[in-house]
């Protein structure tokens, strides 16, 4: 064994020590233990070793770096094996590939470590395979590094790295993938350029930015970290939920940058939110666009609710829209995953104007139906151009609700008469008013749908999945219901945004800078 290591150290060039030589050699192959009595090579189907960083990844799969790939000299293993390896078969070049002998707890083979034991098993098992060079596609890179589905690394970047590779036969280890992503530029603040401040809140500041990696616009949500408290729980919730929510109508979280002083969430950038959109069209939206936006809200919510995720803070400022008309749910800071059976949650969660009456009266046991009341309020606001229940206090909010929908009774809302807060307010006995009087632009089907959202009893509110099938959306055609989750409704040629009657050309998309810009993305 000592003679083997001495000969190896004299043969391999570019390494400073024997251990380094062995470690470098281990990246090309792993010696396999066998019960075979002789030393003849055994040809087996092996798997390529896992790379440990972008540089080693590129080194293994390309010849683009100056350092030549490591080759096994004929004199190292012995004449018979050396001559065997030197003989090409069928005119093709063969490379050595070995199966891992044993995987350690860190995902690396025992022989691949520079601190491995000096005892090296005799190389009795060798795997050979043809080395086929090909250019890595974007799909390969996404698969290899688990990049977000809509991240498109520019072709020029791939050309600069000069990457070419055989097919990927196994995923990278978690540690290797982290290193690879970091070396590409993910997780680093220097990858992003701040262009302008969009808004500032208690815990966070939001900037419009640009990614140097993709050249795309991004929204940078910079959350200040208090050393005593760490990251706000809202930030932790948002990250933990968004990383698992991949849908055409949910904002995409591209990257996370963590430093000692801040946690920056890198989102896809959309031009404006629904509040700004309504302001820009003078609060007179095309009823066709109202229908398209409502459908997209329901589509994103249905996806969340199928996964038992409650948004809990629906409002126009949290619905982002791009120039194409694609609407996406944003700001999941108050969202949380709901387990079964129902648990008790905080009742201080939803913006006042869009908060359902059961939560206003102190209920802390709720399900996905908590979001559906807010959908009804937003539907009304888009159709009428004004908020439905703009209360300034909890009592004022309840008063506005009861005055329009009628003061609830034991018959219309079982259990309300025993609610202490309801009894303490002592509201007048209002009779319900026809909704059509307040939203005359809605047709009868729209009035029927909004009524299904605005139910006092939460369990009677129509679920998002069911609402998408309502006759109100019949004019959008049948194909919209068969789209994959990741595909935009605007991929259908029959789905097009119309010009709004009150739209001001000069205001799109440059308005909204300043104090109220992107308040939806702030804590």
UniProtKB/Swiss-Prot annotation:
Quote the catalytic residue positions. Answer: 313 (proton acceptor)
Give the start-end ranges of region Disordered: 30-55, 103-123, 501-523
SUPFAM superfamilies, per database record: Protein kinase-like (PK-like)
Name the catalysed reactions.
L-seryl-[protein] + ATP = O-phospho-L-seryl-[protein] + ADP + H(+); L-threonyl-[protein] + ATP = O-phospho-L-threonyl-[protein] + ADP + H(+)
Composition-biased stretches, type Polar residues, lie in: 110-123
Protein family per UniProt: Belongs to the protein kinase superfamily. CMGC Ser/Thr protein kinase family. CDC2/CDKX subfamily.
Q: What is this protein called?
A: Cyclin-dependent kinase 17
Q: Which organism is it from?
A: Mus musculus
């Amino acid at each position: 064994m000592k003679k083997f290591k001495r000969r190896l150290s004299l043969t391999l060039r570019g390494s400073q020590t024997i251990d380094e030589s062995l470690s470098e050699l281990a990246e090309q192959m792993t010696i396999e233990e066998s019960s075979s009595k002789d030393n003849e090579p055994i040809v087996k189907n092996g798997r390529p070793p896992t790379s440990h960083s972008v540089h080693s990844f590129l080194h293994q799969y390309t010849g683009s770096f100056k350092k030549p790939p490591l080759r096994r000299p004929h004199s190292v293993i012995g004449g018979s094996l050396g001559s065997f390896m030197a003989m090409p078969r069928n005119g093709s070049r063969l490379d050595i590939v070995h199966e891992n002998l044993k995987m350690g707890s860190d995902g690396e083979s025992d022989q691949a470590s520079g601190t491995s034991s000096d005892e090296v098993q005799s190389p009795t098992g060798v795997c050979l395979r043809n080395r086929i060079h090909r250019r890595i596609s974007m799909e390969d890179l996404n698969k290899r590094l688990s990049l977000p589905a809509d991240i498109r690394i520019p072709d020029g970047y791939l050309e600069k790295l000069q990457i070419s590779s055989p097919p990927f036969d196994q995923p990278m280890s978690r540690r290797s993938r982290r290193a690879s992503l970091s070396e590409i530029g993910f997780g680093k603040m220097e990858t992003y350029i701040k262009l302008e401040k969009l808004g500032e809140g208690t815990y966070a500041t939001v900037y419009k930015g640009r990614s140097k990696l993709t050249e795309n616009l991004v929204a940078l949500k910079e959350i200040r970290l208090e050393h005593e408290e760490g990251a706000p729980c809202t930030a932790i919730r948002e990250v933990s939920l968004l990383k698992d929510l991949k849908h055409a109508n949910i904002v995409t979280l591209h990257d996370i940058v963590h430093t000692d002083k801040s946690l920056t969430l890198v989102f896809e950038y959309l031009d404006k939110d629904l509040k700004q959109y309504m302001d820009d069209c003078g609060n007179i939206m095309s009823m066709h666009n109202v229908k398209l936006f409502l459908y997209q809200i329901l589509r994103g919510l249905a996806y969340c609710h199928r996964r038992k995720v409650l948004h809990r803070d629906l409002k126009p400022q949290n619905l982002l829209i791009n120039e194409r008309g694609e609407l996406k749910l944003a700001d999941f800071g108050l969202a949380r995953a709901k387990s079964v059976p129902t648990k008790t949650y905080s009742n201080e969660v939803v913006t006042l104007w869009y908060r359902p009456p059961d939560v206003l009266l102190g209920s802390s046991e709720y399900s996905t139906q908590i979001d559906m009341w807010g959908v009804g309020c937003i539907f009304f606001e888009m159709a009428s151009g004004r908020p439905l229940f703009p209360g300034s206090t909890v009592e004022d909010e309840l008063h506005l609700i009861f005055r329009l929908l009628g003061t609830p009774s034991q018959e219309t809302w079982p259990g309300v008469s025993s609610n202490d807060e309801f009894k303490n307010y002592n509201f007048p006995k209002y009779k319900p008013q026809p909704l059509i009087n307040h939203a005359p632009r809605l047709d009868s089907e729209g009035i029927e749908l909004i009524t299904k959202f605005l139910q006092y009893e939460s369990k009677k509110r129509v679920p998002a999945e069911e609402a998408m099938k309502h006759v109100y959306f019949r004019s959008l055609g049948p194909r919209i219901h068969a789209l994959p989750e990741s595909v935009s409704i605007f991929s259908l040629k029959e789905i097009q945004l119309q010009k709004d009657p009150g739209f001001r050309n000069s205001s799109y998309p440059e308005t909204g800078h300043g104090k109220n810009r992107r308040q939806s993305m702030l804590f």
